[in-house]
């Protein structure tokens, strides 16, 4: 069925912003995956990085896996958030503007800057703490001397905490945006019922 030419399709600018950021974050994790695979292919004659990481999951290497998994969860969360903004702006016809727009910007920045930085820092901390970064930087020459260093992880606690706080602030701002949009629509619905 073809829509009439004079109809206008409603769109959500906030849903578009969150979907675009999810696509960008997806490109980042794809690049990171290709980078890991390329490094493994280059160093395959000297060490099997994937095998080493899977055998040393108890130590700092788990930060690599957790950061990677959390990054993928973050991408899905950003894309899912777009559905909520679309519902508010298109279905409920609640334009996000004014104070709610400021909250939505904090939400977008908090999720993308705070969330992405937390997960990427966790991945980097795992690479450094597990000793894999040393192998990569030396071209795979010191595979015999590979030893995890848990003490190096202490320097990542404060940056991870700061960016986790930015993420939480963004999520709280997003929750407030959702709540204000929903309650505003409820008031409008109650006014229509009272007028009828």
Predicted segment positions?
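Glycine-centered secondary-structure boundary/capping sites
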Residues: 1, 89-96
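Membrane-interface helix-boundary motifs at transmembrane edges
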Residues: 11, 94-101
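Cytosolic juxtamembrane amphipathic/interface segments immediately preceding
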Residues: 2-12
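Hydrophobic cores of alpha-helical transmembrane segments in multi-pass integral membrane proteins
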Residues: 15-92, 102-188, 192-195
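Intrinsically disordered terminal tails
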Residues: 1, 195-196
């Amino acid at each position: 069925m073809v829509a009439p030419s004079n109809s206008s399709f409603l769109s959500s600018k906030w849903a578009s912003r969150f979907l675009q950021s999810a696509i960008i974050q997806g490109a980042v994790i794809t690049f990171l995956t290709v980078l890991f695979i390329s490094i493994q292919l280059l160093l395959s004659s000297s060490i099997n990085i994937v095998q080493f990481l899977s055998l040393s999951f108890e130590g700092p290497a788990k930060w690599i896996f957790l950061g990677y998994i959390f990054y993928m969860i973050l991408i899905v969360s950003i894309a899912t958030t777009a559905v909520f903004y679309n519902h508010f702006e298109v279905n409920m016809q609640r334009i996000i503007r004014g104070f709610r727009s400021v909250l939505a910007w904090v939400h977008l920045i908090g999720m993308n800057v705070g969330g992405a930085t937390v997960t990427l820092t966790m991945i980097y901390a795992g690479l450094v703490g597990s000793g894999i970064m040393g192998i990569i930087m030396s071209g795979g020459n010191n595979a015999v001397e590979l030893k995890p260093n848990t003490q190096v992880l202490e320097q990542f606690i404060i940056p991870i905490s700061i960016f986790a706080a930015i993420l939480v602030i963004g999520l709280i701002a997003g929750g407030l945006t959702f709540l204000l949009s929903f309650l505003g629509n409820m008031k409008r619905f109650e006014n229509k019922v009272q007028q009828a």
